[in-house]
């Protein structure tokens, strides 16, 4: 019996998740990763709602819960560390506002779990230190191939090419062409992330301190010995963009935050300058990827995850969940089209599957990534009055919410309904 040949670019989250589902329908899947090894790094990510349902169907939910970060919730503090509002972790899915989701894990742990769940599956092969150089496609809508040249010198033909290679996707550029309009939507925020040694009184909360002048300092703690520090700013982009080396980036951040009235700002700037843990510093301008309708795919090439729909780290925190949902639906629609043509490669029409995948998943993305610049200005206010306003509103909201949901500490119902087609017969039974 023939099988579909699928090439996936990117071994992060969406790529391996798609490989998992495609393996179930007998596809021959090759995952190429530009890095010479698995990139099991990154900051804390969250899973919620349908993302948890998908991991449950994959059989990896227990593995994820075993490495869940012990974060208790989000805490707003003033420059002296006094708590102004606290939003506990939401186990019920009913809270008005809870940035800390039921399942919060480090990105590296999720990447490793997905890789371990797929690396020995029948028909799945990983190739590291390898990327797509270029590809071309046959014109025929059915039965044609996408012809790919890889950086290791090999050339092959596939029935489908999936670009799951992130926000700076090379696959996307090759698919759409260099003349396609710029897809990055700048959110007007610069974020820096680094690790610092923890202290005895550091809590396992997501602590947020707003600083006048359009800045904020945040911390999250996923392990006893370290704390993760986040610096956010709406100013100083020229200095930060000009900083190319690690030393220059540290100096630029120190100059921007030194002397500000931020909670423990002196401690964290000292860590940034002198602690070896802070050498993992990563800086980025926050942006979204928002492709126009119909642009998630072209012919037999299709985009997945941040390559197609990056909502941004401050765009609702749904990127990881979206990638898992997208991988599930894409593979499911491929399976449906494959069965519909009698599993005959000469009659398989990838475009039917990829267009339906976009139709089903796009509403989820659109509803959760419509963040405009005024919302960013609200989150990072310029004035002391703006900072106090945020703290007051947060305190009122937290007080109302806590009185309504206090004590709700049980995980979400394990029979939570699958809101997408049950392609593989693994969804919760009524």
Swiss-Prot record:
Alphabetical keyword list: FAD, Flavoprotein, NADP, Nucleotide-binding, Oxidoreductase
Consequence of gene disruption: Abolishes the production of eupenifeldin.
Family annotation (InterPro entries): FAD-bd (IPR002938), FAD/NAD-bd_sf (IPR036188), FAD_aromatic-hydroxylase (IPR051704)
Top-level EC class as recorded in UniProt: oxidoreductase
Cofactor names: FAD
Binding, FAD: 11-14, 33-34, 43, 107, 282, 306
Pathway: Secondary metabolite biosynthesis; terpenoid biosynthesis
Record GO terms (molecular function): FAD binding; oxidoreductase activity
Biotech use, per record: Eupenifeldin is a bistropolone-humulene meroterpenoid first discovered as an antitumor and anti-leukemia agent. This metabolite also shows anthelmintic activity against the parasitic worm Hemonchus contortus, anti-malarial activity as well as antifungal activity.
Entry-linked Pfam families: FAD_binding_3
Cofactor details (free text): Binds 1 FAD per subunit.
Record remark on domains: Consists of an N-terminal FAD-binding domain with a Rossman fold, a substrate-binding domain and a C-terminal helix that bridges the 2 domains close to the antibiotic-binding site. This last helix is flexible and may contribute to their different substrate specificities.
PANTHER family in UniProt: MONOOXYGENASE, PUTATIVE (AFU_ORTHOLOGUE AFUA_8G07040)-RELATED (PTHR46865:SF7), OXIDOREDUCTASE-RELATED (PTHR46865)
Similarity remark: Belongs to the aromatic-ring hydroxylase family.
Name of the protein: Flavin-dependent monooxygenase eupH
Organism: Phoma sp
Gene behind this protein: eupH
């Amino acid at each position: 019996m023939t099988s579909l040949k699928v090439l996936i670019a990117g071994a992060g989250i969406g790529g391996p998740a798609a490989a998992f589902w495609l393996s179930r329908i007998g596809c021959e899947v090759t995952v190429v990763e530009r890095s010479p090894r698995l990139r099991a790094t990154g900051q804390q990510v969250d899973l919620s709602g349908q993302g948890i349902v998908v991991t449950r169907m994959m059989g990896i939910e227990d593995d994820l819960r075993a490495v869940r970060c012990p974060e208790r919730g989000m805490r707003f503090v003033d420059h002296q560390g006094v708590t102004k509002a606290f939003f506990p972790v939401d186990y019920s899915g009913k809270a008005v506002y809870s940035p800390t989701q039921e399942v919060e894990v480090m990105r590296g742990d999720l990447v490793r779990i997905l890789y371990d769940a797929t690396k020995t599956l029948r028909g799945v092969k990983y190739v590291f230190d390898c990327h797509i150089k270029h590809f071309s496609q046959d014109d025929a809508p059915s039965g044609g191939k996408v012809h790919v040249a890889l950086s290791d010198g090999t050339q092959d033909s596939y029935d489908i090419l999936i670009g799951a290679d992130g926000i700076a996707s090379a696959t996307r550029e090759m698919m759409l062409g260099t003349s396609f309009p710029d897809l990055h939507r700048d959110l007007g925020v610069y974020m820096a992330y680094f690790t610092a040694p923890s202290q005895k009184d550091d809590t396992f909360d997501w602590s947020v301190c707003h600083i006048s002048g359009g800045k904020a300092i945040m911390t999250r703690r996923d392990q006893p010995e370290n704390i993760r520090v986040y610096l956010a700013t709406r100013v100083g982009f020229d200095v930060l963009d000009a900083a190319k080396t690690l030393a220059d980036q540290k100096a630029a951040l120190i100059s921007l935050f030194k002397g500000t009235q931020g909670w423990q700002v002196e401690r964290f700037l000292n860590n940034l300058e002198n602690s070896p843990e802070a050498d993992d510093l990563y800086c980025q301008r926050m942006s979204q990827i928002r492709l126009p309708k119909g642009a998630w795919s072209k012919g037999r090439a299709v985009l997945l995850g941040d390559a197609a729909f990056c909502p941004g780290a401050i765009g609702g925190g749904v990127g990881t969940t979206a990638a898992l949902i997208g991988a599930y639906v894409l593979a499911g629609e491929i399976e449906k089209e494959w069965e519909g043509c009698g599993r005959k490669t000469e009659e398989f029409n990838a475009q039917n599957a990829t267009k339906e995948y976009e139709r089903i998943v796009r509403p989820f993305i659109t509803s959760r990534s419509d963040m405009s610049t005024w919302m960013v200005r609200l989150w990072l206010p310029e004035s002391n009055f703006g900072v106090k306003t945020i703290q007051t509103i947060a305190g009122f909201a937290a007080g109302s919410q806590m009185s309504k949901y206090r004590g709700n500490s049980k995980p979400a119902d394990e029979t939570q309904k699958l809101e997408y087609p049950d392609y593989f017969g693994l969804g919760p039974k009524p």
